[in-house]
Regions:
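Alpha-helical transmembrane segments in inner-membrane proteins
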Residues: 1-311
Length: 311
């Protein structure tokens, strides 16, 4: 584990050193493209991927449901709706987008859990509740696009997901939420390990299960909302990464280690998806969210088909 983390960190360090040392002596246009286009875009994909991967892992562990993720649970759609509202109502206030996105994400997950509680708290009910809330929030987003086409003309790409045009102020505000959220998620790892023993056993060992589960869900919601603010509606990454890692490392790593790997591989997957989105049909660019949906939707169907086998 430590060797893997060291190797990833070393690779990332050498990559950024090569970028910044390569700027020395470069032409002015090249320097501007690297500094104000490529670097913010890559950093945005790294931060957003880490947040979505880690958020998906936290949700799955808190709800004991491997089908849970920010996109499936309606968190992404709720955050996206309120972030779009903030961009329309307060276009000059960057912080408003993050605050309203968090409120939208919190509203969505609250609706999902409320519906699931009323309908019978089971795995399938939680997933169906999330799909319903996602559809509701998605319809509201489409309504804004339909009724205010001129106001959202430059924001429609937000609904498809991507990092084109990302600037440093957005990165700064996202890092303010994502980095503490990642730290909080790592600190919650000990309690998540106890979740696996069952609520009664965890309670007997001194863990306040309700409070710890609430903190875990709030942390996951903050991470997902911040990721939506910089990358738009990128779905399925929080579902794919934790489940793939669980198939390889389940039972061999602690929750804190699995959380760390979910963030790292989420970053790697989103950076790779962003690269492919730019290169597959060059000079045209695919939305990153569309590319991940093409990968994630079949994976989600496969998960549903195998749920009775305990996956």
């Amino acid at each position: 584990m430590s060797a893997l983390l060291f190797g990833l960190a070393l690779t990332l360090l050498f990559t950024w050193f090569s970028v910044f040392f390569g700027l020395h002596g470069a032409a002015g246009d090249v320097r501007r493209i690297l500094c104000y286009v490529r670097v913010p875009r890559t950093l945005g994909a790294l931060l957003s991927g880490a947040a979505l991967g880690a958020s998906g892992y936290l949700m799955q562990e808190a709800l004991h449901n491997t089908l849970a993720s920010p996109s499936v649970m309606g968190v992404n759609a709720g955050a996206g709706l309120f972030a779009l509202l903030a961009a329309l109502l307060f276009p000059a206030v960057t912080a408003a987008r993050f605050v309203l996105a968090f409120l939208g994400a919190l509203l969505s997950i609250s609706l999902v859990l409320l519906i699931a509680r009323r309908a019978g708290y089971s795995r399938s009910v939680i997933v169906l509740s999330g799909v319903a809330v996602s559809a509701l929030m998605g319809a509201a987003v489409n309504g804004l696009v339909t009724f205010f086409p001129h106001a959202v003309a430059d924001k429609q790409a937000f609904t498809l997901g991507g990092f084109a045009g990302l600037q440093y102020d957005g990165l700064f505000f996202s890092a303010v939420f994502i980095l503490p959220g990642l730290l909080a998620g790592a600190l919650l790892g000990g309690g998540i390990d106890l979740f696996a023993l069952g609520d009664e056993v965890a309670q007997g060992l001194g863990l306040s299960v309700t409070r710890h589960r609430l903190l875990t869900m709030v942390t996951a919601t903050v991470l997902a909302a911040a990721a939506v603010c910089i990358g738009g509606l990128i779905g399925f990454l929080g579902l794919i990464v934790p489940n793939v890692l669980r198939r390889f490392f389940s039972g061999r790593m602690s929750a804190r280690q699995m959380f760390t790997l979910s963030g790292l591989y989420g970053s790697a997957l989103l950076v790779a998806a962003d690269f492919l989105a730019r290169r597959l049909f060059y000079p045209y660019e695919l939305p990153v969210g569309l590319l991940l949906s093409l990968l994630g939707a079949p994976f989600f169907i496969w998960m549903l088909m195998h749920r009775k086998r305990g996956i």
